[in-house]
Swiss-Prot record:
Protein name in the entry: Ribosomal RNA large subunit methyltransferase E
Domain of life: Bacteria
MF (Gene Ontology): rRNA (uridine-2'-O-)-methyltransferase activity
Role, per record: Specifically methylates the uridine in position 2552 of 23S rRNA at the 2'-O position of the ribose in the fully assembled 50S ribosomal subunit.
Length: 209
């Protein structure tokens, strides 16, 4: 019994230490959140963003992903970000505050995108968690479905999509829908993602619709 207690305690300590490592590293590098490391890991494996690209970042606040994206896209690139929460300005990022689920906010976002198609759609969106899977999972799936809808509206042929998805009810159906829209779809679990989290990232390339 005592051995099991020590193991559980050790696991909790390791998780907290692991989290602290990324939080401290983010602070040291001037990154706004530990989530920035997730996009960096996806970029290292899948080379999603290249100089000169146009990127849409959904669920952007506090700005960790936008910081990474604007650096990768460079001076000739463009990053358009949206979140229901406020976000301090980032040089090179066009930020729209509003609820992405509302039609008027979606229209405003599409206006900022303009007539030209975008190269990459990013979504790190997640609902406010209630602790009830029966409530949280449908909310989370609704958000990722909206992100895929955004791809259908703005993504250029052969464009890319990276989206956070929580494994659970609706995941398999969503994976099927993403595979129908893209040539290649990979499931990633970044090292910087909390081990206890059900979140994974779908990285889809070669938009074909």
């Amino acid at each position: 019994m005592s051995g099991k207690k020590r193991t559980a305690s050790s696991n909790r300590w390791m998780l907290e230490h692991f989290d602290d490592h990324y939080v401290k590293l983010a602070q040291k590098r001037g990154l706004r959140s530990r989530a920035a490391f997730k996009l960096e890991e996806l970029q290292q494996k899948d080379q999603l963003i290249r100089p000169g690209m146009t990127v849409v970042d959904l669920g952007a606040a506090p700005g960790g992903w936008s910081q990474v994206a604007v650096k990768l896209a460079g001076d000739k690139g463009k990053v358009i970000a949206c979140d229901i929460l406020p976000m301090d300005p980032i040089v090179g990022v066009d930020f729209l505050q509003g609820d992405f689920r509302e039609e008027k906010v979606l229209e405003a976002l599409l206006t900022r995108v303009g007539a030209d198609k975008v190269d990459v759609v990013l979504s790190d969106m997640a609902p406010n968690m209630s602790g009830s899977d029966g409530v949280d999972q449908p909310r989370a799936m609704y958000l990722v479905e909206l992100a895929l809808d955004m791809c259908h509206q703005v993504l250029a042929p052969n464009g890319s999509f990276a989206v956070k998805v929580f494994q659970g009810e609706g995941f398999d159906e969503y994976m099927k829908a993403v595979k129908e829209a893209f040539k290649v779809v990979k499931t990633r679990k970044p090292d910087s993602s909390r081990a206890r989290s059900r979140e994974v990232y779908l990285v889809a390339t070669g938009y074909k619709l």
